[in-house]
Swiss-Prot record:
This is Small ribosomal subunit protein uS12. The modification 3-methylthioaspartic acid is found at residue 89. It comes from Polaromonas naphthalenivorans (strain CJ2). Residues 113-125 have a biased composition (Basic residues). Part of the 30S ribosomal subunit. Contacts proteins S8 and S17. May interact with IF1 in the 30S initiation complex.
Amino acid sequence: MPTINQLVRQGREVEKIKSKSPAMENSPQRRGVCTRVYTTTPKKPNSALRKVAKVRLTNGFEIISYIGGEGHNLQEHSVVLVRGGRVKDLPGVRYHIVRGSLDLQGVKDRKQSRSKYGAKRPKAK
């Protein structure tokens, strides 16, 4: 425990809060170009082929981001919008790609949670 005199001389050091999505550099979203689109397997106990893309952002960062929803039209050189948000069972994946923006289309025939997947409202019959 420091003395009052030591605190007057030095002061308390404020703990720096580490960002959970450093590549965003305090932006809500970032644009980037896909350098590789592939599938990967999650950690135990889950089992699947998760769709991910390696993206080079406009600020020069190279990140791995998750492609949510069923089916996608991404390939190399696709321009995408990236937001923060990790995928718990994929180590190293700390970003999501925004559906229905730039080159990535929304999920087809999506009825519920449409805004999260960039799907338009279906025509009423």
